[in-house]
Amino acid sequence: DVYKRQPQGLPKQLLLPTSHEHISLLPSSTALATLERQSPGQSGLGLVIAKSLAQLWQDFDYAVIDSPPLLGVLMVNALAASQQLVIPVQTEFLAVKGLERMVNTLTMINRSRKQALPYTIVSPLFDRRTQASLSTLRLLKHTYPEQLWQAYIPVDTRLRDASRAGLTPSQFDGNSRGTIAYRALLKHLLAQQPASQVA
């Protein structure tokens, strides 16, 4: 856990290999759940991930940071370390309300950055059979025409089956609808900012 090693940074020995060549994993620990209470007011805590990843850029082209949607130390770290943000928003009313708060937070954070953090909104678990999904997707397209990825990730039981089998979607079924959609999303993100970090 990079927070346990702070301020020393991120030793390479913390990285774990995966079944995919050139892809490594840096898992978190359960201590992150209590980080906010453990380190109140500690200086420099919001830059731990950014400083740690800076030591690894000679070995990696991209870093994907998966953080909870709550504004706290983890989210601040992810935003500080990133050059591009991906916001998954299910096509449900409550998820859209949460997106509004997230965008407002980003607007405030961008005022203190040298360069605004671009973001892409993605609609996962989209079910075209339901009116709720269809109407919510229309709302997202109307409200965020520039930020919304115009495609979507469909509901696909093969993704759930892959997780249960302990495999990536491409390993489990490279031709499933969900896998093809995620592949298209990756291509879209890389084309937008080929040298970026994506959070």
PLM regions and their residue ranges:
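P-loop NTP-binding core
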Residues: 1-199
